[in-house]
Amino acid sequence: MARHPRWTLSQVTELFEKPLLELLFEAQQIHRQHFDPQQVQVSTLLSIKTGACPEDCKYCPQSSRYKTGLEAERLMAVEQVLDSARKAKNAGSTRFCMGAAWKNPHERDMPYLEQIVQGVKAMGLETCMTLGMLNESQAQRLANAGLDYYNHNLDTSPEFYGNIITTRTYQERLDTLEKVREAGIKVCSGGIVGLGETVTDRAGLLLQLANLPTPPESVPINMLVKVKGTPLADNDDVDAFDFIRTIAVARIMMPTSYVRLSAGREQMNEQTQAMCFMAGANSIFYGCKLLTTPNPAEDKDLQLFRKLGLNPQQTRVLAGDNEQQQRLEQTLMTPDTDDYYNAAAL
């Protein structure tokens, strides 16, 4: 039995129809009840196997069905993955996410996946993977290896889903989330704004997520990154206020979940990102690439954090390998210069 309020579509629709400033005020109040409003969880995402995916997700440049110019790459060597994780940690990330362009992993891949989970965990980082669909055995093996989070997005509402993906069903996505949860792994699941969906579809997506038996611990909200060669390359741009509104509704509906600004941040100016944080976003992906799409450079993120008075969650640093962590702390703590201003002091 669910241990949290069940939402109805009419209730969610009412939230989307609220005046924006009233909605933001409500979302910020709820956010402060459950989180430190000045703290942001920082994750890094690495593509451990890029391209040649057999699925037909219309937004994705990694699909083998579309000519996007993306070159397929084999699985990364274990040592290369661990080196990337170490650099991510020392740049300030507390969670290391690893993604593979698969419909699902094969049994032959499991020892490799278990090894990199164990290696990243040994560094003191939280681990997350996104590998497509899982069966019960695979979910349990990843749990036994120490995997903390598994990402499997619902993408959109059940009603609109068939317009975007035909190679796996909505129910298969829900089934994977259930298997992950039953294995004892935390769930990361969200969706994409800008696929051509209606506001009702956005409400339907959040309704599905919030009404899971246990809501996801992490909810990534992506803004569509339009890639030439994909069927959605000519979609209309997402209005910034519509995106901010979606963040706020997600925060209200899932008050204890981390709401993550995910793909599309490169397209957002600082003011839009600031309003997303006000709306209750408290997690970002950090670094120059998000799988195969651009992401703001690390220094740019640090500058924005300092302007807004935000602090990344801290992580332990390996002795003798802390240059980037020192730069992170120096950027956030040094007195104002011409490059920065303290928004909290205005």
Swiss-Prot record:
Residues 38-256 form the Radical SAM core domain. Transmembrane segments: none annotated. Coiled coil: none annotated. Its cofactor is [4Fe-4S] cluster; [2Fe-2S] cluster. [2Fe-2S] cluster binds at C97, C128, C188, R260. Binds 1 [4Fe-4S] cluster. The cluster is coordinated with 3 cysteines and an exchangeable S-adenosyl-L-methionine. Binds 1 [2Fe-2S] cluster. The cluster is coordinated with 3 cysteines and 1 arginine. Its EC number is 2.8.1.6. Pfam families: BATS, Radical_SAM. It catalyses: (4R,5S)-dethiobiotin + (sulfur carrier)-SH + 2 reduced [2Fe-2S]-[ferredoxin] + 2 S-adenosyl-L-methionine = (sulfur carrier)-H + biotin + 2 5'-deoxyadenosine + 2 L-methionine + 2 oxidized [2Fe-2S]-[ferredoxin]. It is an enzyme of class 2 (transferase). Pathway: Cofactor biosynthesis; biotin biosynthesis; biotin from 7,8-diaminononanoate: step 2/2. One of its GO terms (molecular function) is biotin synthase activity. GO terms for biological process: biotin biosynthetic process. InterPro entries: Aldolase_TIM, BATS_dom, Biotin_synth/BioAB, Biotin_synthase, Elp3/MiaA/NifB-like_rSAM, rSAM. [4Fe-4S] cluster binds at C53, C57, C60. Homodimer. Belongs to the radical SAM superfamily. Biotin synthase family. Catalyzes the conversion of dethiobiotin (DTB) to biotin by the insertion of a sulfur atom into dethiobiotin via a radical-based mechanism. This is Biotin synthase. It comes from Salmonella gallinarum (strain 287/91 / NCTC 13346). The lineage of its organism: Bacteria, Pseudomonadati, Pseudomonadota, Gammaproteobacteria, Enterobacterales.
